[in-house]
Every structure is written in C-alpha cells, then in structure tokens.
C-alpha cells in the first residue's frame, strides 16, 4: 500500500493489457504463406483429427493456425488470411484461417452460418 506522498510523486501506473494474438501486431488480420498443412489431436475429453496449418506471416512470424469447416483446398505455399481466435482444445493454436479469402476456398454445400465459412448463397435458398 503506497503512502499519500508516494502517490503524489509517482502516481499509479496503468497495467499493460497483454495481447491474445501478438503475432498480428495489433492488426485485425494478416496475410501469410502455408509452410506445412497437417492434422493434430485435441486435448483430453475430445477425440478428432483437427486440420491445422503452419503459416509464415508477412511480418516473418511463424504461427499455427486452425482451418475451420469441413474439407479444405490448402497445401504448401497457399497464401492465406489469418485472424486471431484460439481453438480451446488445441494447445498452442491461437489463430484461425479465414475461409473464402485469398487461396482458402469457402466450405462447399454450407447452408447455415455461411459468412463464417466463405460459402456463397445456394441458388434454391429462399429468405
């Protein structure tokens, strides 16, 4: 507990907020190139093969990014757009690839939540 005198002399220093996506350096998204596309198994109660990509961002930082949706067309040297957002059951995965931007195609046959997966509106869908 500081004394009144200490508060007058030094004041209170505001706490620095730690970024949850430091590799983006304050940007909403960053472009990157896939170095390796693979699968990863999730943490304990869950079981699956989650699709991930190792991406070298335009600022030179390498990150592991999750590929959302069913099926993808990504391979080595694909150019992708990366956003922040962790995957709770994959340790160390703090970024996601944006589907439907650059080389990442949208999810085929997606009818609900299409904007999140870069899917075009189907011809027969009514309002």
UniProtKB/Swiss-Prot annotation:
Family: Belongs to the universal ribosomal protein uS12 family.
Residue numbers bearing the 3-methylthioaspartic acid modification: 89
CDD domains: Ribosomal_S12
PANTHER family for this protein: 30S RIBOSOMAL PROTEIN S12 FAMILY MEMBER
Coiled coil: none
One of the Pfam families matching this protein, by short name: Ribosom_S12_S23
Cellular component terms (Gene Ontology): ribosome; small ribosomal subunit
Molecular function GO labels: rRNA binding; structural constituent of ribosome; tRNA binding
Biased amino acid composition, Basic residues: 11-20, 112-127
Descriptive protein name: Small ribosomal subunit protein uS12
Organism listed in the record: Thermotoga maritima (strain ATCC 43589 / DSM 3109 / JCM 10099 / NBRC 100826 / MSB8)
Keyword Glycosyltransferase: no
Function description: With S4 and S5 plays an important role in translational accuracy. Interacts with and stabilizes bases of the 16S rRNA that are involved in tRNA selection in the A site and with the mRNA backbone. Located at the interface of the 30S and 50S subunits, it traverses the body of the 30S subunit contacting proteins on the other side and probably holding the rRNA structure together. The combined cluster of proteins S8, S12 and S17 appears to hold together the shoulder and platform of the 30S subunit.
Cross-referenced SUPFAM superfamilies: Nucleic acid-binding proteins
Keyword tags: Methylation, Ribonucleoprotein, Ribosomal protein, RNA-binding, rRNA-binding, tRNA-binding
Subunit note: Part of the 30S ribosomal subunit. Contacts proteins S8 and S17. May interact with IF1 in the 30S initiation complex.
Residue segments, region Disordered: 11-30, 105-127
Any single biological process term in GO: translation
């Amino acid at each position: 507990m500081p004394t009144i005198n200490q508060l007058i002399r030094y004041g209170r220093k505001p706490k620095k907020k730690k970024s949850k996506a430091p590799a983006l350096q304050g940007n909403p998204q960053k472009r990157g190139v896939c170095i390796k596309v693979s699968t990863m198994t999730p943490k304990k109660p869950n079981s699956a093969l989650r699709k991930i990509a190792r991406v070298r961002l335009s600022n030179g930082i390498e990150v592991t990014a999750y590929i959302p949706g069913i099926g993808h067309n990504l391979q080595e040297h694909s150019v992708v757009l990366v956003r922040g957002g962790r995957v709770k059951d994959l340790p160390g995965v703090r970024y996601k690839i944006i589907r439907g931007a650059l080389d990442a195609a949208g999810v085929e046959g997606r009818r609900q939540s299409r904007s999140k997966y870069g899917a075009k509106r189907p011809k027969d869908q009514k309002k």
